[in-house]
Amino acid sequence: MNFTRIIFFLFVVVFATASGKPWNIFKEIERAVARTRDAVISAGPAVRTVAAATSVASG
């Protein structure tokens, strides 16, 4: 019984210190969307080149 309380207390202490900085889910989503947007923008010239090569190859 005491061992369980000690483990629980240690878990609470570790969790309290680890969550000192709250995790903002909307900020993480915003970063993921920005990375996706930047990847699409940077892939644009390559996609145009492949499309042009395909149209040249097909006729």
Swiss-Prot record:
The modification Serine amide is found at S58. Has antibacterial activity against Gram-positive and Gram-negative bacteria. This is Antibacterial peptide enbocin. The lineage of its organism: Eukaryota, Metazoa, Ecdysozoa, Arthropoda, Hexapoda. One of its GO terms (biological process) is defense response to Gram-positive bacterium. Keywords: Amidation, Antibiotic, Antimicrobial, Immunity, Innate immunity, Secreted, Signal. GO terms for cellular component: extracellular region. It is found in: Secreted. Residues 21 form a propeptide. It comes from the Eukaryota. Residues 1-20 form the signal peptide. It comes from Bombyx mori (Silk moth). Belongs to the cecropin family.
